[in-house]
Amino acid sequence: MSRKCQLTGKKANNGYSVSHSHIRTHKLQHANLQWKKVWWPQGKKWVKLKLSTKAIKTLQSKGIQAMAKQAGIDLNKF
């Protein structure tokens, strides 16, 4: 499975590590992804998703049904 949030689509960012002598080397800044089991009340079941921590915070205010609809995800497949 890829390192990508299943609800927001958040993924790694290309950046540079800059040393004291200003030598720049490429580095990936990965999203903070967590496996999270979320209760889906409409489906009456637990859904296990790989979510960014930002998405977990947004879930608490919006709810899983609204976020899944916005992302175009069918929760029955999880």
Curated annotation (Swiss-Prot):
SUPFAM superfamilies: L28p-like. HAMAP family: Ribosomal_bL28. This is Large ribosomal subunit protein bL28. PANTHER family: 39S RIBOSOMAL PROTEIN L28, MITOCHONDRIAL, LARGE RIBOSOMAL SUBUNIT PROTEIN BL28M. GO terms for molecular function: structural constituent of ribosome. GO terms for biological process: translation. Pfam families: Ribosomal_L28. GO terms for cellular component: ribonucleoprotein complex; ribosome. Transmembrane segments: none annotated. Keywords: Ribonucleoprotein, Ribosomal protein. The gene is rpmB. Gene3D superfamilies: Ribosomal protein L28/L24. InterPro entries: Ribosomal_bL28, Ribosomal_bL28/bL31-like_sf, Ribosomal_bL28_bact-type, Ribosomal_bL28_sf. It comes from the Bacteria. Belongs to the bacterial ribosomal protein bL28 family.
